[in-house]
Structure formats: C-alpha cells, structure tokens
C-alpha cells in the first residue's frame, strides 16, 4: 500500500535542471533529429520507460499538434486515447487563481484585501502574522503559510465534520492559528495557501470550488474535467504510477483509501483533464498574454501573470531559450503535468504523463522545452 505524497513543489529545481540539460543538446547533434510532437513524445516514453505520455502544441488560433502514446497501466494492454484524462496536480493552482480573479472583477473581492478583512469573524484569533496578508500575496506563495507538501503534515489536521464547504471553513480557521512555515512576504510554496484560497472563493461566490470551476471556467472553454484519480471506481482511464525505488514505476490503485487526495486541499491541485482540454486552458492564457483575453479583462490577466520574483498567481515566470516563459509543473506523486507558454513566439506546450516520479516529471519538462525550441 502506497501513501503518495501531496502536490510537490517541483517548479524551480526541475525547470532549472531541464534548462541546463537542454542547453546545446540539439545544436551539435551528429544527425538530423525529428522534433515533431509524436517523435519527441515517443523518445521520452521509451528512454524513461513511462507508461504513457500525452502532449499538445498550441498556437493562439488553434491546437496545432496533439498526440498520446503508451498504455493506461503498466502490465495491462489498454492503450491511452486522446479522450483519456491525466491528473494535473499543482497545475490546478492557475485555475483557482482565475476563479478568484473573476470574484475580483465582480467587486466581491480585491487583490489588496487582507485575511483579517476576509475572515472578520475570527480575525482576532488568527495569528498576527497572517492578518495583513493580502489575497494577491496568498496566490503568490508569500503568505508564510506552511507548505503542506508532505502527507505527514496532514496528521495534525483535526477531523472536521459537516458539509465539504463547512469542513473547509473550519480547516481555514484552524490553519490560520498555526505557526507560519516561513517569513511572511518571502516566497514559500504552499498547498495550504491555495487550500485557503479555495475557501475564500467559496465564501465570496457562495458555491463550492468544484461547481465554480466547472461552470465558470471549464464549461465556457468546452472542457469536461473531473476530480480525484481518473481511474477511480473502475473507470476505463489511466492509472497513476509511483516510484517504488531505484526508478521502478508501480501502478497506484486509484481506489486505495491511503492514496486519496485530501478534499480540503483540492483547490491546490486535484483535477484531471484530457490533453486536449488542458491545451484549451493553456490557449486561454496564451491568447491573453498576446492581447486577446477571454473570460477576464486584459488588465486582470496582466495582474495574474505579473511575477513577484519568479512566481505570479498560479504561474512561474522565467526565461527559457531566451524567451520569457510562463510555466508550471504539477505532480501528486503518480502523474505529472507540464505547461509552458511563450507568448512572444505564439506557442504553448503541454505534456502529461501517468508517472509521478521526479525523473518522469523532469523528462516531461525536457520534452516540453524541446518542443518549444522547435
């Protein structure tokens, strides 16, 4: 029985490693290399022994290329299809940020509203360090809230009762009484911060995070997504695979009670989409970065995409191959998701895999960088 990790903070270390690994990698190739999407995915699948991999190359006017390769589960014959879903992990954070931006545009929230103002009924009981944290700082991982990237951190969380929304509200009250994980104002990747952001969204909009993401974000984009593991309940979908040691990938039972994503943390990273649908989400942000916003105003998208240091709201921002790139990496230990956007070159790339080891996610990032370069 495998107790998988929570959504892991892969951004800085893995992207830096991928950038270094890609520098000059193809410039001195002794023979021509096929850089088409299917060829890049095929090499990645074979060289890293992945169960399956999916990817798309996106332009502002279309999804230019899309492909899936491999099997749903190691040791089983079923091949993946374009309609199969992959778990996104932390790449869901950008979606949660978009939903909060909608509340800001509606006038029900403000970027500079503090946690004390958002939760006035228990402002006096929350730790003083958190009272002045703004919504914007929360989404930029500068709240000081603990990371919550390890299942062991959840053992201290009480078993709250009530509806899902009531339990999330109680968890927010509890969380804001806990010691900070680091100095407020400094970058500290925090799943707890985005869990709290989900509570703020639910309070403001008067509906669950799950219903809001489906009706306000996915439906307008033509996306059909879900929550939890894609193959839960016997669904004919990809299984996730975890690293059992020495790089050996083992299927994770999607119905194992010890392997479920905590619903309190769902806004931080628990949703699954097909590669085509995730490409549609990437295209939304590519078009916005190129001055063609949908669902939100140009000014709001600019705010979402403006980095404080190297992280904006749900997006890392860093040069890749000489071009400013908005990116994110997500994994809850059994799947991996990569998105990279270069608006200056009118391109976005998404790569998904049903393996969650660090090697697998790094391989997916290498593939994405190769696709960006060609």
For the regions a protein language model found, what residue spans apply to each?
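Sec-dependent bacterial lipoprotein signal peptides
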Residues: 1-21
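Short, surface-exposed loop or secondary-structure junction motifs
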Residues: 62, 71-73, 126-333
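Short, gly/Ser/Thr-rich active-site loops of penicillin-recognizing serine hydrolases
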Residues: 321-324, 354-374
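Short, well-ordered beta-strand elements
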Residues: 328, 336-355
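Short, conserved catalytic-motif segment at the N-terminal edge
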Residues: 34-86, 110
């Amino acid at each position: 029985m495998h107790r998988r990790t929570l959504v892991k903070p892969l951004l800085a270390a893995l992207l830096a490693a991928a950038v270094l690994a890609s520098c000059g990698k193809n410039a001195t190739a002794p023979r021509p290399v096929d850089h088409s999407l299917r060829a890049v995915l095929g090499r990645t699948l074979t060289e890293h022994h992945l169960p399956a991999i999916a990817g798309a190359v996106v332009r502002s006017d279309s999804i230019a290329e899309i492909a899936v390769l491999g099997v749903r589960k190691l040791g089983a014959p079923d091949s993946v299809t374009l309609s199969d879903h992959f778990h996104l992990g932390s790449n869901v954070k950008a979606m949660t940020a978009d939903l909060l931006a909608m509340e800001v545009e509606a006038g029900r929230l403000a970027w500079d509203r503090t946690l004390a103002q958002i939760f006035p009924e228990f402002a006096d009981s929350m730790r003083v360090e958190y009272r002045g944290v703004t919504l914007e700082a929360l989404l930029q991982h500068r709240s000081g809230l603990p990371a919550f990237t390890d299942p062991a951190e959840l053992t201290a969380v009480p078993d709250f009762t009530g509806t899902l929304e009531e339990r999330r509200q109680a968890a927010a009250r509890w969380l804001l009484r806990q010691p900070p994980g680091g100095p407020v104002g400094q970058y500290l990747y925090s799943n707890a911060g985005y869990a709290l952001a989900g509570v703020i969204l639910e309070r403001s909009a008067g509906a669950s995070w799950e219903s809001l993401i489906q009706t306000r974000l996915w439906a307008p984009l033509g996306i059909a997504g879900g929550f939890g593991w894609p193959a839960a309940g016997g669904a004919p979908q990809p299984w996730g695979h975890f690293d059992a040691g020495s790089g050996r990938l083992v299927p994770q039972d999607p119905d194992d009670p010890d392997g479920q994503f905590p619903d309190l943390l769902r806004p931080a990273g628990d949703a699954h989409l097909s590669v085509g649908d995730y490409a549609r989400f990437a295209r939304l942000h590519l078009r916005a970065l190129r001055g063609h916003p949908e669902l939100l105003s140009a000014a709001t998208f600019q705010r979402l995409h403006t980095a404080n240091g190297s992280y904006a709201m749900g997006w890392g921002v860093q040069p890749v191959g000489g071009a400013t790139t908005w990116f994110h990496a997500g994994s809850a230990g059994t799947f991996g998701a990569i998105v990279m956007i270069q608006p200056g070159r009118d391109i976005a790339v998404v790569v998904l895999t049903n393996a969650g080891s660090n090697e697998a996610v790094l391989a997916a990032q290498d593939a994405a960088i190769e696709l960006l370069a060609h």
